Amino acid sequence: MSNSSSVSEFLLLAFADTRELQLLHFALFLGIYLAALLGNGLILTAVACDHHLHTPMYFFLLNLALLDQACISTTVPKAMANALWDTRTISYQGCAAQVLFFVFLVGAEYSILTIMAYDRYVAICKPLHYGSLLGSRACAQMAAAAWGSGFLYSILHTANTFSLPLCRGNVLDQFFCEIPDILKLSCSDAYLREAALLVVSFCLAFACFVFISFSYVQIFRAMLRMPSEQDQRKAFSTCLPHLAVVSLTLSTALVAYLKPPSISSPSLDMVVSFLYSVVPPAVNPLIYSMRNQELKHALWKLIGYMLLLHQ
C-alpha cells in the first residue's frame, strides 16, 4: 500500500448541497439504521434465547442477521456522521477498512444464503437424512466456511485495490468506499484489474445463483409430489422468506454492477448503491418475520418479556 501514500484521505460524494437536505438525509439514514439494528437484534436474541429455534434453519438465519447488522454498520454510521457534521472526508486507512469489511460481509452473506437454500433442500427433499446431513458439527463447519471464504475473498480484493498507485485525485463518486470507484483514481491502467474483479465477482455470484436455483427446482418438484395441500403450503411458507431475501439481494447487486455505463451518473450510482448496501440489511428481518409463525411467536414472547422487565 505504500504506492498510494500520496493520498492520505478520500472525499466521499455528498448527499445534498444544502444544510437542510443534509440533515434530512441524516435523519433518514438514522431511522433506517436503527430499524435494521432493532430488527436484526431481535432476531439474534430470539433465536439465541428460544430453544425451539435451535435448529439448522434458525442457526443460519442467526448468521444472516449478524452479517446484516455488521454490513449496515460498516457504511451507514460514517455516512450519517458526514451528513451531520457537513464533511465528506474519510481517511485512507478508514477507507481500506471499510472496503475490507464490506466485501468480507457481503461475500459471507452470499455463501450463507446459498447454504440456507441447501438447508431447505435437505429439509423438504431428504427429510429422513436431515439430522445426519445438517447436524450441529456440519452446520458449524458450513458457517465457518462461509465466513472464512468471505474474509479470504475480501483480503485478496482489498490488497489488489490498495496496492495500486493513486494519482487521479481523491474524490470518490459514492457515499462509501467501493472498489470500482477507487480503481478509477489509479495512475496505472486498472481496466484489466477492474474487468478481472467484475468477472470473479460475477462468477461467484452466478455460482451461488445456480446452486440456489437448482435447489429450488428440486424443492418445487418435491412439493408437487406431496399428497396434502396443507403440506405443500407449509413447505412453501418455509421457503418464501429465503426466496424473497435472495431475490432482493441478488437483483440489487446485479443492477449495481451490470448497469450500462451509458446511463451511469454519480447520483444514480449512489441511489443504486444505497439499494444494495442499505435496503437488504434493513428489510431482511421484516421479510423473515412476516410469514414465519415460529419466529413471530418467539419475537412476541421476547418483546413481552422485555416489557415485563420494565414494569
Q: Where are the regions that the model predicts?
A:
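Transmembrane helical core of 7TM receptor-like proteins
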Residues: 1-311
